[in-house]
């Protein structure tokens, strides 16, 4: 039962209506009424506002006259807010009798414009307000939409209406319809059919909706109109409007008027190829459309492309105003304007997708200049009568010229030259008849079908029509005259060449079209293609991001091809790079023209390629006014497009950028794009697919058991003969090549295959093969050479460090190396397994430990062993005293690492880069820490970038960097124990020669407390001692030889000066006695010995050449080489320093541990507190009062 009504103020309060965007059926009351309601503690949910006003009464028929005005009422709820606007002057509203108050003293009631339109109020209307504080309540409401369009909108937003109806409507009435707001751009009108209990609104004419009320919506479907034959016609349009919208009248225009359709130029995959062979110039329509009165019984129709005035090209001043005109120059070829209306045969389209599309044959599309275009608006109507049979006896064909003809060629009519050949007139006519009468190409020959005056003929190679031509009907004075060539006898003549002058439909404001890719050319992005296609077909826009070489343009080409072939979208590509340097007004006009063109050819997908080149992101310390202006113009154009285009999926946007950060923030944050799809670098399986596609696809084993043959398209042949066949070695696994190319983009892989193929060609040329048809075998070594020195596009300009360290060079640290492998190598090696892992992978590690324990060496070795790029950072590289410079260095550093991913970013001496905040007088390190916290945020994660930090004082690092999500795990590089020291010595001894009798365990026992760097110093010092011993022994040999002893160097006395067995270590000048001098070697003696050695080398080369000439070169060279190698090995074995126990003892005496015992204990306590935990004692926060103490900035 309805409760008894309790009114607020009993008198009506005059007010003026003010329209505002409330988006509900509630009103804002004047401040005077609000004060009364607030003082009485009345809830806003219990208030119903009654608005009443007077309007002129409608005229009545008959002698009786009614009242001059009538009263209307509207009921609404209260928002709980007062009006903010001042009242306006009344416009066209009646005034209340006896009211003497001025407008300035009257309040303003604010109401939404859509709701006001439904109830009949306008801006400035004068109303009376009556408040109902305790109105009757209803718990069940039956509503129905006003129109079928309202029902369709409500059905589309049923869930939103269910959740938000009570927040928009509070009072219901039978007196006027109500408005519901279902989306930012759509509203629907409803009316109340019945309420329960039925007597709730009977006494007052309105009721309040209970909080738990049930709302029942009755559907309202469209009424199908019946044709005159009594059958129902589909709701789809038989004669579509300019934008391809459906018409309610399914019978089509009557009386033979024009009918409009949306064109699909053939060939098209939705069209059967067999049907296309039925005619040369013809159009295809659904059989149901052929039954409408305008087209019933028509065999031929006139076809015209409708061009809107706003998109028409500017008129050509060189052309005459009439249809046939010429140039002012007597020597220039004649210009004939083609006909805009062409008569074509009308045929049924059995598998038509709907009733609004029309298929245009290939030749007709070429004549109308809409070849390979979807979306043009075509007007067709029944063709008028043919020309009388006696009026036309000649058909003249005027070929198009490739260029301007000379005067002699223009005057010479007996011999004409086309396509590089001289054609006699009779021969040319016969050739034209032959090519235009072929039935195998177009199904029906051109000359046997409908021939329209000034019909454009296609370009036919190896004929006088090599550039196309135009057909003229001699004696035709009727505009758009035509004849049926198969029913007439006429004389075919070939006229002189003319200059082409064809009207162009503005199909694209950019001359650069998207690349046309063959089927299956792009691989590994099926998910992105399906996602983008589904989103675009649902009237949402997509932003495609990806680095250079990721295949954005190729992917866009595939997506637009799908939309064009399967969903009949018109594609409008715009290359933004071409407009990047244009004037702002030119860019704005380009946007306007693109939007207008897209609306005309809708549904349309507008492709903005390289949008970040036109609208880059705003940067610091630079003027970004131009970018912001263009971004605002772009956003306004898109918003105007969305608000003006009706119907789902009319115009959508597909844009490509390198990253969402590279484009202006107004574009990404302006609700322009519904979805952002990122093209990342392909994984290992994806790279394998790209490599297979690049080499032509793997095939089964062919005739050769060792190779699998692949025929590649257009390979660079070694000769001018047949193209060679590229063969892939059977043992070559492209998966291994994919594992070596981590981080490569598809474009990089394509270039890599080209480099490998070039290496194979070079190898084949160097092999001296005379077989012109020899197959090229692409092997692993070709890819190894191609990868060597190759820098992917994403890494060009990125400074990377290289390290020669490997696992074998590192001893000890077994557990630490294991964790590093798990963190860095396993996600790359076992990518499919980790892709399904639900846990977040570690991306940051802290290496801490005693100085000299191998932290830096471990970090440099892990990058090379795991196949990752390596960037090393020291403190001074990023610290800068200027405000903002250090933060920019950190940002640039992480951007470099992201560009080089997978990459290891190594911070050495991390405690100097990121100390605890609050203890820096300049604040530089504090800002660096804040920036690093932002870059290493655990919520976002670092994709492909691993952070390694090394320090010996982890207690000095800011604790925020050590939390999970940043530096997830800390690894201790402890002092080596006995086993670790043996392992370290074993790794170091690989590059040195130690006496076999010395055991590494003995050295390890004597080096307790030594770090890895100390052990390296011990061995290197011992190696230096061994080198000194070798040098001393050689000096002793030289000294003994100089004293006449038998040393290593001696000369055979019987051989003389011309025969040299070997060169001695010391050969001084001979004195008068003929004995070698024992004086110390001077610069002169050294020069003489060098000259003697050079002479001996020249004699050896001459002897070698002499033996080669004698025909015994190979054997002699081999014997000499073996003797030389043997002598070098013996000499090397004799001179190589060997570390013995004496050298090690000497080294141990001079080498001490780099870490003192006290320092080692102190560091042990620090590391123990870092692992176990710190005490709860915290500083008081007061600044230090000591002399020289630093005060905190926090």
UniProtKB/Swiss-Prot annotation:
Entry's Gene Ontology BP terms: protein import into peroxisome matrix
Skewed-composition ranges (Polar residues): 1066-1084
Complexes and interactors: Interacts with PEX6; forming the PEX1-PEX6 AAA ATPase complex, which is composed of a heterohexamer formed by a trimer of PEX1-PEX6 dimers.
Domain of life according to the entry: Eukaryota
Compositional bias ranges of the Low complexity kind: 1116-1127
Binding site for ATP: 546-553, 849-856
Primary location recorded for the protein, binned into one broad class: cytoplasm
InterPro entries assigned to the protein according to its UniProt record, in alphabetical order: AAA+_ATPase, AAA_ATPase_domain, AAA_lid_3, Asp_de-COase-like_dom_sf, ATPase_AAA_core, ATPase_AAA_CS, CDC48_domain_2-like_sf, P-loop_NTPase
Keywords, in A-Z order: ATP-binding, Cytoplasm, Hydrolase, Membrane, Nucleotide-binding, Peroxisome, Peroxisome biogenesis, Protein transport, Repeat, Transport, Virulence
PROSITE patterns per UniProt: AAA
GO cellular component terms, A-Z: cytosol; peroxisomal membrane
Provenance organism: Arthrobotrys oligospora (strain ATCC 24927 / CBS 115.81 / DSM 1491) (Nematode-trapping fungus)
One Pfam family linked to the record: PEX-1N
Residue ranges, compositional bias (Basic residues): 221-234
Catalytic activity, EC: 3.6.4.-
Consequence of gene loss (knockout): Leads to growth defects with sparse aerial hyphae, and reduced number of nuclei in hyphal cells. Also results in complete elimination of sporulation and trap formation and a remarkable decrease in the ability to trap nematodes. Leads to defective cell wall biosynthesis and increased stress susceptibility. Results in the up-regulation of the proteasome, membranes, ribosomes, DNA replication, and cell cycle functions, and the down-regulation of MAPK signaling and nitrogen metabolism.
SUPFAM superfamilies referenced in this protein's UniProt entry, alphabetically: ADC-like, Cdc48 domain 2-like, P-loop containing nucleoside triphosphate hydrolases
Catalytic activity, reaction form: ATP + H2O = ADP + phosphate + H(+)
Name of the featured protein: Peroxisomal ATPase PEX1
């Amino acid at each position: 039962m309805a409760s008894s009504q309790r009114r607020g103020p009993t008198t009506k309060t005059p007010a003026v209506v003010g329209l505002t965007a409330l988006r509900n059926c509630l009103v804002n009351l004047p401040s005077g009424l609000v004060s009364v309601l607030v003082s009485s503690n009345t809830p806003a949910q219990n208030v119903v506002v009654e608005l009443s006003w007077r309007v002129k009464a409608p005229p009545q028929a008959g002698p009786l006259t009614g009242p001059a005005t009538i009263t209307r009422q509207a009921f609404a709820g209260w928002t709980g807010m007062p009006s903010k606007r001042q009242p306006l002057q009344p416009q066209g509203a009646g005034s209340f009798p006896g009211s003497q108050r001025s407008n300035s003293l009257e309040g303003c009631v604010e109401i939404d414009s859509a709701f006001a339109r439904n109830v009949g109020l306008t801006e400035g209307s004068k109303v009376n307000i009556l408040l109902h504080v305790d109105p009757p309540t209803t718990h069940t409401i039956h509503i129905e939409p006003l129109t079928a369009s309202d029902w369709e909108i409500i059905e589309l937003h049923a869930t939103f209406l269910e959740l938000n109806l009570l927040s928009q409507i509070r009072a219901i009435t039978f007196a006027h319809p109500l408005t519901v707001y279902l989306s930012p751009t759509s509203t629907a009108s409803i009316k109340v059919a019945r309420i329960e209990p039925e007597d709730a609104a009977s006494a007052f004419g309105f009721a309040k909706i209970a909080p738990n009320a049930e709302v029942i919506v009755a559907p309202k479907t469209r009424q199908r109109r019946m044709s005159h034959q009594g059958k129902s016609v589909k709701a789809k349009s038989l004669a579509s409007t300019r934008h391809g919208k459906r018409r309610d009248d399914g019978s089509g225009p009557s009386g033979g008027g024009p009918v409009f359709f949306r064109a699909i130029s053939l060939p098209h995959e939705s069209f059967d190829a067999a049907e296309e062979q039925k005619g040369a110039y013809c159009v295809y329509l659904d059989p149901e459309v052929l039954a409408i009165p305008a087209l019933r019984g028509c065999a031929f129709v006139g076809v015209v492309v409708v061009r809107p005035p706003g998109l028409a090209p500017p008129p050509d001043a060189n052309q005459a105003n009439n249809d046939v005109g010429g140039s002012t120059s007597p020597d220039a070829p004649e210009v004939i304007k083609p006909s805009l209306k062409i008569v074509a045969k009308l045929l049924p389209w059995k598998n038509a997708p709907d009733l609004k599309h029309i298929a245009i044959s290939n030749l007709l599309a070429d004549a109308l200049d809409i070849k390979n275009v979807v979306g043009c608006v075509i007007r067709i109507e029944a063709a008028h009568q043919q020309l009388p049979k006696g009026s036309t006896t000649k058909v003249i064909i005027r070929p198009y010229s490739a260029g301007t003809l000379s005067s002699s060629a223009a005057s010479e009519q007996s011999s004409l030259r086309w396509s590089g050949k001289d054609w006699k007139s009779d021969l040319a006519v016969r050739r034209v008849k032959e090519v235009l009468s072929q039935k195998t190409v177009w199904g029906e020959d051109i000359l046997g079908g409908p021939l329209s005056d000034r019909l454009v003929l296609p370009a036919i190679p190896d004929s006088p029509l090599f550039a196309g031509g135009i057909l003229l009907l001699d004696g035709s004075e009727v505009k758009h005259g035509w004849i049926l060539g198969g029913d007439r006898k006429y004389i075919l003549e070939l006229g002189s060449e003319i200059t082409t002058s064809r009207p162009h439909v503005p199909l694209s404001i950019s001359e650069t079209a998207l690349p046309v890719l063959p089927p299956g050319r792009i691989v590994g992005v099926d998910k992105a293609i399906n996602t983008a296609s589904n989103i675009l077909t649902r009237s949402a826009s997509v932003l495609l991001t990806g680095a250079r070489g990721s295949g954005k343009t190729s992917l866009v080409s595939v997506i637009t091809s799908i939309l064009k072939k399967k969903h009949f979208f018109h594609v409008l590509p715009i290359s933004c790079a071409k407009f990047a340097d244009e004037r702002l007004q030119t860019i704005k006009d380009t946007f306007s023209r693109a939007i207008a063109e897209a609306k005309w050819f809708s549904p349309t997908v507008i492709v903005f390629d390289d949008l970040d080149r036109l609208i880059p992101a705003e940067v610091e310390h630079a003027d970004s006014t131009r970018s912001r202006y263009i971004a605002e113009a772009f956003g306004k154009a898109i918003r105007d497009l969305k608000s003006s285009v009706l119907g789902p999926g009319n115009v959508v946007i597909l844009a490509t950028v390198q990253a969402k950060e590279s484009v202006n923030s107004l574009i990404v944050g302006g609700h322009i794009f519904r979805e952002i799809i990122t093209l990342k670098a392909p994984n290992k399986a994806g790279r394998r697919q790209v490599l297979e596609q690049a080499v032509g696809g793997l095939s089964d084993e062919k005739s050769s058991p060792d190779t699998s043959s692949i025929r590649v398209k257009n390979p660079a042949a070694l000769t001018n003969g047949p193209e060679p066949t590229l063969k892939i070695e059977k043992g070559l696994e492209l998966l291994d090549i994919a594992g070596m190319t981590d981080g490569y983009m598809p474009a990089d892989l394509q270039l890599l295959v080209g480099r490998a193929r070039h290496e194979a060609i070079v190898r084949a040329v160097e092999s001296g093969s005379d077989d012109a048809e020899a197959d090229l075998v692409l092997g692993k070594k070709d890819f190894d050479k191609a990868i060597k020195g190759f820098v992917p596009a994403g890494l060009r300009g990125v400074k990377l460090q290289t390290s020669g360290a490997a696992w074998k060079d590192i001893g000890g640290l077994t557990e630490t190396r294991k964790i590093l492998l798990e963190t860095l190598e396993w996600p790359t090696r076992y990518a499919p397994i980790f892709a399904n892992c639900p846990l977040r992978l570690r991306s940051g590690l802290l290496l801490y430990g005693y100085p000299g324990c191998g932290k830096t060496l471990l970090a440099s070795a892990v990058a090379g062993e795991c196949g990752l790029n390596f960037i090393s950072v020291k403190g001074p590289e990023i610290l800068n005293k200027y405000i903002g410079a250090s933060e920019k260095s950190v940002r640039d550093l992480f951007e470099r690492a992201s560009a080089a991913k997978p990459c290891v970013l190594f911070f050495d001496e991390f405690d100097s880069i990121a100390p605890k905040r609050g203890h820096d007088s300049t604040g530089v390190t504090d800002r660096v820490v804040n920036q690093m916290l932002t870059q290493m945020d655990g919520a976002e994660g670092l994709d492909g970038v691993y952070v390694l930090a090394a320090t010996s004082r982890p207690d000095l690092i800011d604790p925020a960097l050590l939390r999970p999500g940043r530096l997830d795990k800390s690894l201790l590089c402890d002092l080596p124990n006995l086993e670790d020291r043996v392992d370290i010595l074993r790794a170091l001894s690989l590059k040195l020669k130690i006496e076999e009798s010395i055991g590494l365990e003995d050295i390890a026992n004597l080096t307790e407390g030594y770090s890895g760097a100390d052990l390296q110093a011990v061995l290197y010092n011992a190696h230096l001692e061994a080198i000194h011993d070798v040098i001393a022994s050689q000096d002793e040999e030289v000294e003994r030889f100089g004293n006449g002893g038998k040393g290593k160097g001696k000369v055979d006395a019987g051989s003389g000066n011309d025969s040299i067995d070997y060169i001695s270590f010391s050969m001084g000048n001979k004195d008068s006695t003929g004995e070698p001098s024992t004086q110390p070697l001077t610069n002169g003696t050294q020069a003489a010995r060098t000259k003697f050695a050079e002479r001996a080398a020249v004699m050896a080369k001459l002897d070698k050449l002499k033996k080669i000439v004698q025909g015994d070169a190979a054997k002699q060279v081999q014997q000499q080489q073996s003797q030389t190698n043997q002598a070098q090995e013996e000499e090397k074995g004799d001179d190589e320093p060997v570390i013995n126990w004496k050298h090690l003892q000497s080294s141990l005496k001079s080498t001490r541990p780099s870490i003192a015992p006290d320092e080692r204990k102190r560091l042990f306590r620090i590391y123990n507190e870092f692992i176990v935990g710190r005490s709860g004692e915290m500083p008081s926060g007061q600044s230090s009062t000591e002399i020289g103490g630093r005060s905190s900035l926090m």
